[in-house]
């Protein structure tokens, strides 16, 4: 199986370091499962730094809990996939700092990969895509003389537009 390969690749990308030594255990937690669904590793990098990770596909109720923490002599960085808009920098002997995409201190590589202005989540355009998709579905259904899926009818209509104009 591939368990642990993604964590290894991400570790190499983030740190820029190659792994020299590994002590690991992999296995199956779920009874009768024939593939590995758990792995834990202790790592030694080419520069002598140490690292560890554990990975599992058998944590009940957990939704792909990817969490990364890199610690060094000047502080630590932490990122969690469940809160992708925040990178926490924890400098030694100073308060934690939350960094956001395109916010103050954004590095050029990060800015190049960020499509929106600071304060908007990366999924922001998806909300508009959902509105346009639902509106198109409703229009197509009406033209075909059919009923649109009731769940596709939660988009702004002309009355909402009128209320917006009246508000202004």
Feature annotation, model-predicted:
Residues 1-50, 54-63, 159-162:
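Rossmann-like dinucleotide-binding domain that binds NAD(P)(H)
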Residues 13, 21, 40, 45, ...:
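C-terminal glycine/acidic-rich active-site capping loop/insertion
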Residues 164-167:
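Alpha-helical scaffold segments in carbohydrate-active enzymes
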């Amino acid at each position: 199986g591939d368990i642990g390969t993604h964590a290894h690749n991400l570790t190499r990308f983030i740190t820029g370091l190659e792994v020299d030594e590994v002590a690991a255990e992999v296995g199956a937690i779920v009874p009768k499962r024939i593939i590995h669904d758990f792995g834990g590793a202790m790592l030694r990098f080419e520069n002598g730094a140490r690292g560890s990770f554990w990975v599992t596909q058998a944590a009940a109720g957990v939704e792909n809990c990817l969490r990364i923490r890199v610690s060094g002599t000047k502080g630590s960085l932490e990122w969690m996939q469940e809160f992708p808009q925040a990178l926490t920098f924890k400098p030694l002997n100073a308060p934690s700092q939350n960094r956001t995409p395109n916010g103050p201190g954004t590095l050029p590589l990060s800015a190049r990969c960020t499509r929106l202005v600071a304060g908007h989540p990366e999924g922001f355009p998806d909300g508009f895509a959902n509105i346009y998709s639902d509106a198109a579905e409703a229009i197509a259904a009406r033209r075909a003389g059919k009923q649109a899926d009731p769940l596709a009818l939660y988009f702004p209509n002309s009355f909402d537009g009128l209320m917006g104009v009246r508000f202004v």
